[in-house]
A protein has these predicted regions:
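Intrinsic, low-complexity N-terminal interaction/targeting segments
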Residues: 5-6, 19, 86, 92-116, ...
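Inward-facing hydrophobic residues that define packing positions of alpha-helical scaffold repeats
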Residues: 26, 52, 59, 144-147, ...
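Cationic, histidine-enriched alpha-helical/coil surfaces that engage anionic ligands
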Residues: 10, 16-27, 46, 64-65, ...
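Short helix-adjacent coil turns
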Residues: 40-47, 132-138
Length: 206
């Protein structure tokens, strides 16, 4: 019959195996990336970089394994792992002296790179708020400027959604995060100005 003569059963079997393997490896990469971001948030940059290197090795291994099973498998489901690893890489570069290299960048699809960058910029909101709590408003403003730069870059990518794979939605979400962060910093600045005026007034009447 047509099913057996064309080997369709074997094709689907290979694709199923590739999908199951890809999902498993993608989950591992996502977990590694999340731990890297948490380490970077705690300013444990050495461990964050160590985890990124582990994630890159896992990604390279995963790609080889998937290709060995099927060259035609649709790896869309695998892109989440790529994106999360990109987020970890960009976030570490945003908050430390970690250098981005072409060797690392070339590992990823354009979609994973841009979405990962956007999510890393969103993660800077937490970093900015931490600095507000530490009364380091200048650093908070620096992170806000960096978030704005990422938004500007993403808005310059003028291609259909089918090509960018949902980048416009990701950009809109980041823009919303940026505006909330801007509002928080503005309130903190106004509070500081008020406190300074009160302190100046109290000194005058003392």
């Amino acid at each position: 019959d047509v099913w057996s003569s064309r080997g369709l059963g074997d094709v689907y079997k290979r694709q199923h195996l590739a999908r199951e393997l890809g999902l498993s490896l993608s989950r591992e990469i996502i977990g590694i990336s999340s731990r890297s971001i948490r380490s970077a948030q705690r300013k444990d940059f050495k461990n964050a970089e160590k985890l990124i290197n582990e994630g890159i090795k896992k990604l390279n291994s995963a790609n080889k394994k998937l290709k060995s099973i099927s060259l035609d498998i649709n790896t869309t489901f695998f892109l989440d792992g790529e994106k999360e690893l990109c987020e970890a890489i960009f976030f570490l570069s945003f908050v430390s002296n970690y250098k981005l290299t072409s060797t690392k960048i070339d590992l990823f699809s354009p979609s994973s790179l841009l979405k990962g960058m956007a999510e890393a910029a969103s993660e800077l909101r937490r970093t900015s708020l931490d600095n507000i709590r530490e009364n380091n408003l200048k650093m908070s403003e620096n992170y806000l400027d960096l978030m704005n730069e990422v938004v500007d870059l993403l808005e310059s990518i003028d291609y259909p959604e089918g090509v960018t794979q949902g980048l416009r939605r990701t950009t809109d979400q980041l823009r919303s995060v940026v505006e909330r962060t801007r509002g928080d910093i503005t309130i903190a600045l106004q509070r500081n100005q008020l406190e300074e005026k009160i302190e100046t007034f109290l000194k005058k009447i003392d």
